From Swiss-Prot:
Primary role: Core subunit of the mitochondrial membrane respiratory chain NADH dehydrogenase (Complex I) which catalyzes electron transfer from NADH through the respiratory chain, using ubiquinone as an electron acceptor. Essential for the catalytic activity and assembly of complex I.
Entry EC number(s): 7.1.1.2
Protein source organism: Emballonura alecto
Protein name as catalogued: NADH-ubiquinone oxidoreductase chain 1
GO function terms (MF aspect): NADH dehydrogenase (ubiquinone) activity
Positions of transmembrane segments: 2-22, 70-90, 100-120, 140-160, 172-192, 217-237, 253-273, 294-314
Enzyme class: translocase
HAMAP family attached to this UniProt entry: NDH1_NuoH
Phylogenetic lineage: Eukaryota, Metazoa, Chordata, Craniata, Vertebrata
Keyword Protease set for record: no
This protein's encoding gene: MT-ND1
InterPro entries: NADH_UbQ_OxRdtase_su1/FPO, NADH_UbQ_OxRdtase_su1_CS
Main location as per UniProt: mitochondrion
Length: 318
């Protein structure tokens, strides 16, 4: 039964990722006053399926000088971790109801760094290695702020469990009292998923394609799926943390529908940002984090720790 549940979670995620690629191409197309893909199927709806067939039927090339086992393992690990991160997410019920769901997601996203590092190192290409080192530095840096912001939100919620957040936000979305945290969280998720304007790892002008430059066909598709699964995942967490979802036990469909709509709107915002902003310079990216976000998030975290301690000493006003 667990296997059936697992498949019922994985297959929709992969389908969502497939159609997110189409949505991205269509959105960017219309923002640049053109149509986007419209040949394969009605209005280009079958384009992702055609792309998948093309990629998975190509010959899996690998460089002669590469470390074979690592080269093959890296994309598999990337996708496995991207899909594993979904397990504690309440939609409205999680696949595994974890007591420390937030901690699990943080740990899994930290492990994703290894797949990037392996792919860059095993490719035995200078472009791939530079891209991988950039990606690792960027991901590790922005995880610091993500963890501190999560801690601040969890202090308001009072629990590490994700379903508790919907109970916390029954009367008021957390984005309203904690909007600076929400803004910093959103920008950090952009950087964490290597999206524009922080897509320095795949800077076409200087690094060809970043850490996946030597990958082709199926293995490239696995990295691609992992990247887009992480984008949807991050937006789903943003929705759960800040755009509270009212859970009515008699109408679980309502929760799922509102969750889906909010996540979709957040994802479209990601695409909109990609169409609008140029790429950051690498030093600007690091300055933004270490000199702006980190002091701010630490200050806000201390604020959220001190307020309950301060108010605990006030006697109840009866």
């Amino acid at each position: 039964m667990f296997l059936v549940n697992l498949l019922l979670m994985i297959i929709p995620i992969l389908l969502a990722v497939a159609f997110l690629t189409l949505l991205e191409r269509k959105t960017l197309g219309y923002m640049q006053l053109r149509k986007g893909p419209n040949i394969v199927g009605p209005h280009g709806l079958l384009q992702p399926i055609a792309d998948a067939i093309k990629l998975f039927t190509k010959e899996p090339l690998r460089p002669l000088t590469s470390s074979t086992s690592m080269f093959i393992m890296a994309p598999i690990l990337a996708l496995s971790l991207a899909l594993t991160m979904w397990t504690p997410l309440p939609m409205p019920y999680p696949l595994i109801n974890m007591n420390l769901g937030v901690l699990f997601i943080l740990a899994m996203s930290s492990l994703a760094v290894y797949s990037i590092l392996w792919s860059g190192w095993a490719s035995n290409s200078k472009y791939a290695l530079i891209g991988a080192l950039r990606a690792v530095a960027q991901t590790i840096s922005y995880e610091v702020t993500l963890a501190i912001i999560l801690l601040s939100v969890l202090l308001m919620s009072g629990s590490f469990s994700l379903p508790n957040l919907s109970t916390t936000q029954e009367n008021l979305w957390l984005i309203i009292p904690a909007w600076p945290l929400a803004m910093m969280w959103f920008i950090s998720t952009l950087a964490e998923t290597n999206r524009a304007p922080f897509d320095l790892t795949e800077g076409e002008s200087e690094l060809v394609s970043g850490f996946n430059v030597e990958y082709a066909g199926g293995s490239f598709a696995l990295f691609f799926l992992a990247e887009y699964a992480n984008i949807i995942m991050m937006n789903a967490i943003t929705t759960t943390l800040f755009l509270g979802l009212y859970q009515n036990p008699s109408l679980p469909e309502f929760y799922t529908t509102s969750f889906m709509i909010k996540t979709l709107l957040m994802t479209i915002t990601f695409l909109w940002i990609r169409a609008s902003y140029p790429r950051f310079r690498y030093d600007q990216l690091m300055h933004l984090l270490w000199k702006n976000f980190l002091p701010l998030t630490l200050a806000l975290c201390m604020w959220h720790v001190s307020i309950p301690i301060l108010t605990a000493s006030i006697p109840p006003q009866t």
